[in-house]
Amino acid sequence: MKILFLNGPNLNLLGQRQPDIYGTTTLAEIESAVREQAEGRAEIEFRQSNDEGELVTWIQDAVSEVMVLNAAGYTHTSVALRDAITASDVPVVEIHLSNIHAREEFRHNSLIAPVCKGQ
């Protein structure tokens, strides 16, 4: 099985940005832990971008069996990501590092959740 993990804006700052919300674990440490768990069972690829257009292109070009997407701030604003997910034949699972429903009200709504296989 091939799994593509896509990480959106500011996730490159994990470990230093708002540790009270996101913790002190870096994105590289998360990637390492996932690779270790998947070893011998799945081929894992990670990508991170602060650019919405680049994320859209990666979704459009995905050659994997499943995508795991942390769209970060784009979760609540990006019609472009929603449309790219809708157009893709690859199932997408939306993930977050914090509970978006327990945060500021503007974070409660996900534009991408309705077109993902799970949240």
Can you say where each PLM-predicted feature lies in the sequence?
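Nucleotide and nucleotide-moiety/phosphate-recognizing core
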Residues: 33-65, 82-93
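Short amphipathic alpha-helical segments
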Residues: 17-18, 59, 80-82, 105-107
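Short, glycine-/small-residue-rich phosphate/pyrophosphate-handling segment
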Residues: 45-46, 93, 101-119
